[in-house]
């Protein structure tokens, strides 16, 4: 019985060696391209038509206390002397909260009506 077990183990070892994947060359270019694509996607700048005015939005990553946050900034040069700002853990949340902050400030300064502001603040 011992010879059978040893023979079975030897056969299993030979089969495993034949079917093990062969080492291949690492594809660093594809890996680096993928990582850089993800990192550059964290920054975003755009312009939007907001209530008939050209406004701008910027989102950028920020690490605070070993956590990733997204800081958003929304401003409309030539219409409002202030800007909306936010810091959230969500990329899309940073744009939404910066816009809401801008609308709150625009309402306080009389640039928008309560009705127009409620459309943005209730969502």
From Swiss-Prot:
<keyword id="KW-0044">Antibiotic</keyword>
<keyword id="KW-0732">Signal</keyword>
<dbReference type="GO" id="GO:0005576">
    <property type="term" value="C:extracellular region"/>
</dbReference>
<dbReference type="Pfam" id="PF11630">
    <property type="entry name" value="Anti-LPS-SCYG"/>
</dbReference>
<keyword id="KW-0929">Antimicrobial</keyword>
<keyword id="KW-1015">Disulfide bond</keyword>
<dbReference type="GO" id="GO:0042742">
    <property type="term" value="P:defense response to bacterium"/>
</dbReference>
<dbReference type="InterPro" id="IPR038539">
    <property type="entry name" value="Anti-LPS_factor/Scygonadin_sf"/>
</dbReference>
<comment type="function">
    <text>May bind to bacterial LPS and thus specifically inhibit the LPS-mediated activation of the hemolymph coagulation. It has a strong antibacterial effect especially on the growth of Gram-negative bacteria.</text>
</comment>
<keyword id="KW-0325">Glycoprotein</keyword>
<feature type="disulfide bond">
    <location>
        <begin position="55"/>
        <end position="76"/>
    </location>
</feature>
<feature type="signal peptide">
    <location>
        <begin position="1"/>
        <end position="26"/>
    </location>
</feature>
<protein>
    <recommendedName>
        <fullName>Anti-lipopolysaccharide factor</fullName>
    </recommendedName>
</protein>
<dbReference type="InterPro" id="IPR024509">
    <property type="entry name" value="Anti-LPS_factor/Scygonadin"/>
</dbReference>
<keyword id="KW-0964">Secreted</keyword>
<feature type="glycosylation site" description="N-linked (GlcNAc...) asparagine">
    <location>
        <position position="45"/>
    </location>
</feature>
